[in-house]
């Protein structure tokens, strides 16, 4: 018989040593210790309130669990692989400390609903922290936007110069992305923040428990409504992994731009030395390792989403041991996202913008060609005709190695007699930027308003 196992009563042979090691999860689920103890204390108090176990036992259980919590946080608690997981390690130690009272703790619950509770508690805490990290990153973006409020840079499509924009406008684009990420995290929290404890192994419990009381003790606004779903649901974890994948995609896109902008070919920005590394052979190198690594870690998070989706895709109701594989993808993603956000927020705040280089780049590539077309439209020309006229003028400039502002008025009028001296005022970088005053545009007055809106709306 497996005498050392809390579930060993029906077994006549000990667990194979390799099986014990293969099935144990304590190496990674021990990080749930705080949530496991919080859940157990709430469960014990409910059992006492409902007169399912004596209040004297409840006090012993609570005190014992608090002592175990202190031991774990002090690093003096010895975790055992033979006890499989965090739940059994804590319960076994509790029973050893306080005797029979500790054996009453598991009344009316299963490890199935216990672990579901622990993961929800853990994720709930982490979602709040991730939202806070996102807010810090948004703060850094707003800081850069305000610091460089009137800096003009080229905007791109297909990575080709398109139209001039404000650098601040570009920073605010990422503010919008990360605000959506916060919204998704908040939505995920709504679905994670539901109490599963009380579902038992799969069918509920025969004891007169009060699930709503446990929910109140643990600050859950609601309890789950179906015991089968309660123990088999990992949608909230999958939803977080999907949200995290989108979040990391945003960081990866930003990383790619920072990597490009910091090259000697662009020279738009300079990252602080503290966020870069050198080369072991090339002494001149300053490598943007942080954005490169964040870009690389994005694939890791995508993989975690695929891993858990694959684990869950064919599981019959209710709990299956496969679901033990939910924790490592979840924990790894949480660690990756938090680390990436923290370092990104600090890196962006310390980033230096090369104002002159950005402006010089914005003045190249016929970036105000659309403004010429808009000018002709305001003079009465249909847009498609204006588009063709400007296309021909650009072709002429390429052949003559000129830019649009360098054309004489005679050259301009060779393309259209609607063009007058005021064309030159219409195609300056400032005129191009500030003409785009509609909501969402890059005009200075609009960008300033959006910065204030971003501050107030948080």
Curated annotation (Swiss-Prot):
One Pfam family per UniProt: Lyase_1
Coiled-coil ranges from the UniProt annotation: none
EC number in record: 4.3.2.1
Keywords recorded for this protein, A-Z: Amino-acid biosynthesis, Arginine biosynthesis, Cytoplasm, Lyase
UniProt-annotated location(s): Cytoplasm
Catalytic activities: 2-(N(omega)-L-arginino)succinate = fumarate + L-arginine
Pathway: Amino-acid biosynthesis; L-arginine biosynthesis; L-arginine from L-ornithine and carbamoyl phosphate: step 3/3
Cellular component, GO annotation: cytosol
Annotated GO MF terms: argininosuccinate lyase activity
Keyword Lipoprotein on entry: no
Domain of life: Bacteria
CDD domains the record matches: Argininosuccinate_lyase (cd01359)
GO process terms (BP): arginine biosynthetic process via ornithine; L-arginine biosynthetic process
Family as reported in the entry's similarity comment: Belongs to the lyase 1 family. Argininosuccinate lyase subfamily.
Protein name: Argininosuccinate lyase
Source organism (scientific name): Geotalea uraniireducens (strain Rf4)
């Amino acid at each position: 018989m497996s005498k050392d196992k809390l579930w060993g009563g029906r077994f006549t042979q000990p667990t194979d040593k390799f099986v014990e090691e293969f099935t144990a999860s304590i190496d990674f689920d021990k990080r749930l210790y705080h949530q496991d103890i919080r859940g157990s204390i709430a469960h014990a108090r409910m059992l006492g309130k409902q007169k399912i176990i004596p209040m004297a036992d409840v006090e012993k259980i609570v005190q014992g669990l608090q002592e175990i919590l202190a031991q774990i946080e002090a690093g003096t608690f010895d975790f055992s692989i033979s006890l499989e997981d965090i739940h059994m390690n804590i319960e076994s130690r509790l029973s050893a400390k306080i005797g029979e009272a500790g054996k009453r703790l598991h009344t009316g619950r299963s490890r199935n609903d216990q672990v579901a509770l622990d993961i929800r508690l853990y994720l709930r805490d982490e979602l709040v922290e991730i939202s806070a990290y996102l807010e810090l990153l948004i703060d850094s973006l707003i800081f850069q936007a305000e610091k460089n409020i009137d800096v003009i840079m080229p905007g791109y499509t297909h990575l080709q110069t398109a139209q001039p924009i404000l650098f601040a406008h570009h920073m605010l684009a990422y503010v919008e992305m990360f605000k959506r990420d916060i919204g998704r995290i908040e939505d995920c929290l709504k679905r994670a923040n539901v109490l599963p404890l009380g579902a038992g192994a799969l069918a509920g419990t025969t004891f007169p428990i009060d699930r709503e009381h446990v929910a109140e003790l643990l600050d859950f606004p609601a309890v789950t409504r179906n015991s089968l779903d309660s123990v088999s649901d990992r949608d909230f974890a999958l939803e977080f992994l999907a949200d995290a994948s989108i979040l990391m995609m945003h960081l990866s896109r930003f990383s790619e731009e920072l990597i490009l902008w910091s090259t000697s070919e662009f020279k738009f920005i300079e990252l602080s030395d503290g966020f870069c590394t050198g080369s072991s052979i090339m002494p001149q190198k300053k490598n943007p390792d942080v954005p490169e690594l964040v870009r690389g870690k994005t694939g890791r998070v995508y993989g975690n989403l695929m891993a858990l989706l694959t684990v869950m895709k064919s599981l019959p109701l209710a709990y299956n041991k496969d679901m033990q594989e939910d924790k490592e993808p979840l924990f790894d993603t949480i660690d990756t996202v938090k680390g990436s956000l923290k370092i990104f927020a600090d890196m962006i705040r310390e980033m230096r913008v090369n104002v002159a280089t950005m402006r010089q780049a914005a003045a190249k590539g016929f970036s105000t060609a659309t403004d010429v077309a808009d000018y002709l439209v305001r003079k009465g020309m249909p847009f498609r005709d204006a588009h063709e006229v400007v296309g021909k003028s650009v072709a002429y400039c390429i052949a003559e190695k000129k830019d649009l502002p360098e054309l004489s008025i005679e050259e301009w009028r060779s393309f259209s007699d609607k063009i007058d001296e005021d064309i030159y005022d219409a195609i300056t970088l400032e005129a191009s930027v500030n003409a785009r005053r509609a909501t969402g545009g890059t005009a200075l007055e609009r960008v300033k308003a959006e910065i204030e809106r971003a501050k107030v709306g948080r």
